[in-house]
């Protein structure tokens, strides 16, 4: 199947992209050659499809941003496909549990999202001075506040996931959900190498395979379709040598169980009398 098949299948949908923590900062570096989900958005719009980034202060609390995602879904003119990375996936998931939001969604593709939290967030918030500094920076830059990082801790996420377990199971039975994780074993380039030390630390701490920020086990929702690939925490959303974020997204969109449109009916030509 080709890009033409994707155009035909999703012509009436709106794609909503939810960025991760500090995503608006990364997106702002596009003029200096940094890609963060923009190549995926541009590919979709290049196919003539409706694709938009949800405007979120990414350091804000998950619940606050979930309301913003829900509003974006409700404002869409038709059916929606949610594509989210990292913290953005937590907000998309929470939005889908709100009244009438899931009913408008035909798919949720979650890329490297810490549904069960991140040990790195635990470590950062365990240092009071660093926690206060992060909170102040977030407030001064308009990105949110320190609560957004606190929402990524393993304790906070475990509590939230347990409280919403039945709702999540019902959601996955209703909406096609794909969760993608990556694991960093041998960094292929300097971008993945940035996460190498964190990855080794998490393995030594007993967290298992991970992408440098999120353990594989944290990124996979029970009952959803699972995909595990190689790479660091931005490997699936950043175009670079050896990376193919568009190819990853293309593959997952083609696998969403959405009926393809029927081909045009043939024109019957009766023989002349």
Regions from the PLM with identified roles:
Residues 19-21, 85-86, 113, 182:
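Glycine-rich His-Gly loop
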Residues 51, 63-167, 211:
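Serine-dependent carboxylesterase/thioesterase catalytic core
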Residues 24-26, 61-62, 91-92, 116-120, ...:
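Short catalytic/ligand-binding loop motif for oxyanion handling, primarily in non-cytosolic enzymes
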């Amino acid at each position: 199947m080709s890009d033409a098949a994707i155009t035909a299948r999703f012509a009436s949908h709106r794609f909503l992209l939810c960025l991760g923590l500090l995503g608006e900062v990364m997106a702002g570096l596009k003029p200096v050659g940094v890609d963060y989900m923009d190549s995926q958005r541009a590919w979709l719009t290049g196919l003539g499809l409706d694709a938009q980034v949800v405007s979120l202060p990414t350091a804000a609390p998950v619940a606050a941003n979930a309301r913003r995602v829900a509003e974006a879904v409700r404002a869409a003119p038709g059916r929606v496909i949610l594509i989210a990375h990292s913290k953005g996936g937590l907000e998309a998931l929470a939005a889908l549990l709100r009244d009438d939001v899931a009913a408008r969604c035909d798919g949720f593709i979650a890329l490297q999202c810490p549904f069960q939290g991140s040990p790195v967030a635990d470590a950062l918030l365990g240092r009071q001075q660093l926690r206060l500094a992060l909170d102040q920076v977030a407030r001064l830059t308009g990105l949110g506040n320190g609560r957004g990082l606190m929402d990524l801790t393993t304790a906070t996420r475990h509590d939230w996931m347990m409280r919403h377990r039945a709702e999540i199971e019902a959601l996955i039975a209703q909406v096609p959900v794909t969760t993608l994780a990556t694991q960093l074993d041998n960094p292929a380039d300097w971008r993945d190498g940035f996460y190498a030390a964190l990855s080794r630390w998490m393995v030594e701490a007993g967290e298992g395979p991970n992408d440098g920020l999120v353990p594989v086990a944290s990124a996979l929702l029970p009952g959803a379709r699972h995909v595990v690939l190689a790479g660091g925490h931005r490997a699936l959303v950043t175009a670079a040598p050896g990376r193919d974020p568009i190819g990853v997204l293309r593959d997952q969109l083609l696998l969403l169980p959405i009926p393809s449109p029927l081909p045009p009916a043939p024109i019957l030509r009766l023989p002349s009398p």
